[in-house]
């Protein structure tokens, strides 16, 4: 059985694969990872205001509570990803400004016990893989790459 997730869901997919041996493959779409550099400053604002507001150009603002940051900052993501012992694919858009493309390589670099850890960067893809652009070319590529990965690893 495979596990996958997008953005924060990608972060959860990594943690799930690290902590549950039932999964035989893991895949992330713009998977969030260890963002402690940003999170400390945002946490301070959340503590002061009751939340930190994250803005996007594709959805309404997201208000993150201090508890979100406390949880996120308490996890050693590299150590967790190092527990993954199954194939891992980190897909990211080259034009993603929410979870920058370099994040995918950080995930793969931490996956030291995975027998097959790969990065796939998609040209022209933003954080939503261009689903709001009216052109589904990137999305079709993403879906096919996902299908191909799970066919190969499940």
Language model features with spans:
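Short alpha-helix in the alpha/beta-hydrolase fold that links the catalytic acid
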Residues: 86, 100-110
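Catalytic histidine neighborhood in serine/cysteine hydrolases
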Residues: 111-128
């Amino acid at each position: 059985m495979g596990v996958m997730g997008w953005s924060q869901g990608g972060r959860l997919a990594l943690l799930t694969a690290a902590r549950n041996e039932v999964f035989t493959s893991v895949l992330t779409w713009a998977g969030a990872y260890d963002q402690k550099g940003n999170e400390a400053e945002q946490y301070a604002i959340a503590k002061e205001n009751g939340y930190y507001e994250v803005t996007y150009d594709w959805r309404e603002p997201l208000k993150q509570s201090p508890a979100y940051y406390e949880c996120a900052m308490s996890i050693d993501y590299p150590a967790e990803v190092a527990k993954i012992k199954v194939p891992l694919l980190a897909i990211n858009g080259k034009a993603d400004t929410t979870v920058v493309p370099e994040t995918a390589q950080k995930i793969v670099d931490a996956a030291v016990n995975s027998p097959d850890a790969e990065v796939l960067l998609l040209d022209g893809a933003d954080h939503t893989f261009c689903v709001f652009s009216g052109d589904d070319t990137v999305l079709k590529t993403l879906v096919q790459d996902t299908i191909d990965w799970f066919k190969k690893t499940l």
